[in-house]
């Protein structure tokens, strides 16, 4: 196992989508002498990047967020990593339809192509949906899914190819050494199990592990890891027959805080309606201890079952399939 360099201009801790894109963009801006670290293997070190649903809905009432999302999508399109499938946010209540009308004003203001659709139009786009329980929907043709692992790999490899980045996977950060500076202590070195790196700049991009790493330097990142319930349900005949990864628009069932996203011959069903399930970063299992990955924990059915019933009400075919993994 090779040792890390003794010095670097930039050390980025975490090789998920954020860390990879950071080094890629810094390389495009002319930065050199960078090191990227992750305690897990590549290309999938074990964080959320490797298993998130990765869909992008561009409409936001906040102008900056909407423009940032559209700009990101355009970059993914240019790189050939964007899978456009469209997305429909469906309404079960009159109040939700009123919110969709408000969303239309933001979409129009920011130049995002979107329109309100009737239950019949939703049924035409998604033939297996139960339109009888819907009042309408908000359809955005540009909704897409991005391959976050492929995107991160591309950005990382681009920086490596320019000769400005060294990458060290399976390398754990043990400590951050600080020194007094104007405005408060600054990080002067990163201690790893392969050696210590003196650094001018250190970026923490570890996702759910970030608070733990920041604490090594006496800093507090106000982030609490929360478990999100998601299951892969299948196989489902109509999805298998499509022969595509994404043949149908992604559905966001806004009144039940659920989403349904095709994943080839199966359907990903995710829920945000359950109780808050928090974890301390130290409680997250290691790559060796985890059944799938450190951030893919066993489904707690008592939290997920009520939302699954609502998903089946919207798409009854889900009740005839099995949960492949969760």
Residue ranges and their predicted role:
Residues 3-18, 35:
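Beta1/beta-strand and adjacent pyrophosphate-binding region of the FAD-binding site
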Residues 18, 42, 209:
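Conserved Rossmann-like nucleotide-cofactor binding loop
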Residues 27-48:
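Glycine-rich FAD pyrophosphate-binding loop
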Residues 52-125, 255-260, 264-268, 278, ...:
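Dinucleotide-binding Rossmann-like beta1-alpha1 core, especially the glycine-rich loop
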Residues 67-68, 89-99, 138-160, 168, ...:
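Short beta-strand to alpha-helix junction loop
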Residues 86, 220, 236-326:
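Active-site lid/adjacent beta-loop-alpha segment flanking the redox-cofactor pocket in flavoenzymes
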Residues 139-201:
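Helical element adjacent to the flavin cofactor pocket in flavoenzyme catalytic cores
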Residues 192-249:
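Central helical "cap/lid" subdomain
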């Amino acid at each position: 196992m090779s040792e890390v360099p003794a010095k670097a201009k930039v050390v980025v801790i975490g090789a998920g989508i954020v860390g990879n894109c950071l080094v890629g963009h810094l390389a495009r801006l002319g930065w050199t002498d960078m090191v990227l670290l992750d305690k897990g293997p590549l290309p999938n070190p074990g964080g959320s990047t490797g298993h998130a649903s990765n869909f992008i809905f561009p409409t936001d009432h906040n102008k900056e967020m909407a423009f940032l999302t559209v700009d990101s999508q355009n970059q993914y399109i240019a790189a050939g990593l964007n899978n456009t499938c469209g997305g429909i946010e469906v309404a079960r209540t009159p109040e939700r339809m009123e919110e969709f009308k408000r969303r239309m004003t933001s979409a129009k203001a920011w130049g995002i192509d979107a329109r309100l659709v009737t239950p019949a139009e939703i049924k035409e786009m998604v033939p297996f949906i139960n339109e009888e329980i819907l009042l309408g929907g908000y359809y955005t043709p540009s909704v897409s899914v991005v391959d976050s692992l492929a995107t991160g790999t591309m950005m990382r490899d681009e920086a490596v190819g320019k000769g400005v980045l060294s990458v060290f996977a399976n390398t754990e950060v043990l400590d951050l050494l600080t020194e007094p500076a104007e405005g408060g202590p600054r990080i002067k070195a990163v201690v790893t199990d392969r050696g210590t790196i003196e650094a001018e700049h250190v970026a923490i991009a570890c996702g759910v592990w970030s608070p733990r790493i920041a604490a090594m330097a006496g800093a507090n990142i106000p982030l609490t890891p929360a478990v999100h319930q998601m299951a892969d349900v299948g196989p489902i005949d109509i999805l298998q027959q499509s022969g595509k990864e994404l043949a149908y628009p992604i559905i966001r069932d806004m009144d039940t805080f659920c989403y349904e996203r095709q994943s080839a011959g199966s359907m990903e069903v995710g829920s945000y309606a359950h109780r808050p399930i928090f974890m301390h970063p130290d409680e997250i299992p290691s790559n060796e201890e985890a059944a799938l990955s450190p951030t893919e924990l066993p489904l707690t059915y008592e939290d997920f079952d009520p939302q699954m019933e609502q998903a089946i009400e919207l798409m009854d075919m889900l009740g005839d399939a099995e949960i492949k993994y969760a």
